[in-house]
């Protein structure tokens, strides 16, 4: 985090990537609109207009004067409110699906920001630099062939509380990002400004980061976003799979997934 605007929005300077593993959106033609949530993390997910998927679908329909003649099923595989952009990426996926279904363009950045500040960056694959409040996104590289392990201790973290607990909201940005974003050693020197306050509030986050870091072949271990999900970066998916197996056996109550960037 590099600052805060007068309207309360935080100024960010973040590297973001999408992964192969995630929630799934299933869209099919229908006489009228319907929305259903299934999957291991479906419990408690609203199916009314408070859901960002429904808002995104209606935004697309209104923008292009279309009737919502489709059925959408959200397969919820990611923990809720876990710092990995599940809701925002779901909304982005629905918009991409409807763009293809109706053969219409995607909304502009202002329309995306009106739905959610993290949605614009979820439209890009590869490594993307997100700046401003989320409206300034620049794709820097195609996805490196690295392996990732995502770990969540199944403990919630309050995003507003994490932001409010920050010692400083004026921090230096990353330097020479475009030249170094695929350099694992450089990535290991970068930080998540939200991580210290999250660890202080939820000690399980520190436990997870430490457990990932202790795996000999882990290159980088950090918290993702505002937590509580953390990630380990490995040179390939084989090493990530072995690490995920080890972590799941050692901590059966944690959510652990090995995946790749896309």
Name what the model sees in each region.
Residues 62-73, 96-115, 236-249:
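Phosphate-handling active-site elements
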Residues 231-233:
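Short hydrophobic/aromatic beta-strand micro-patches
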Residues 1-82, 99-100, 104-105, 143-145, ...:
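ATP-binding N-lobe of GHMP and related small-molecule kinases
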Residues 82-90, 219-228:
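Short glycine/threonine-rich catalytic loop with a Thr-x-Gly-x-Asp
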């Amino acid at each position: 985090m590099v600052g805060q605007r007068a309207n309360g929005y935080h100024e960010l300077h973040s590297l973001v990537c999408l992964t192969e593993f995630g929630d799934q959106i299933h869209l099919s033609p229908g006489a009228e609109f319907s929305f259903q949530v299934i999957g291991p993390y479906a419990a408690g997910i609203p199916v009314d207009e408070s859901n960002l998927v429904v808002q995104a679908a209606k935004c697309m329909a209104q923008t292009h004067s279309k009737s919502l003649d489709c059925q959408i099923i959200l397969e919820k595989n990611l923990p809720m409110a876990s710092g990995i952009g599940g809701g925002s990426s779901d909304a982005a996926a629905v918009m991409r699906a409807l763009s293809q279904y109706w053969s219409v363009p995607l909304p502009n950045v202002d329309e995306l920001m009106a739905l959610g500040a993290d949605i614009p960056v979820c439209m890009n694959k590869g490594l993307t630099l997100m700046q401003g409040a989320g409206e300034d996104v620049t794709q820097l590289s195609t996805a490196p062939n690295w392996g990732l392990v995502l770990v969540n201790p199944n403990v919630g973290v309050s995003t507003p509380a994490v932001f409010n607990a920050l010692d400083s909201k004026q921090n230096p940005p990353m330097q020479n990002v475009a030249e170094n974003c695929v350099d694992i050693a450089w990535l290991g020197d970068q930080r998540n400004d939200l991580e210290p306050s999250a660890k202080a509030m939820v000690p399980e986050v520190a436990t997870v980061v430490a457990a990932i870091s202790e795996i000999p072949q882990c290159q980088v271990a950090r918290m993702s976003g505002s937590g509580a999900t953390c990630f380990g970066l490995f040179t390939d998916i084989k090493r990530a799979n072995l690490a995920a197996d080890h972590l799941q056996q050692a901590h059966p109550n944690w959510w652990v997934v090995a995946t790749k960037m896309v």
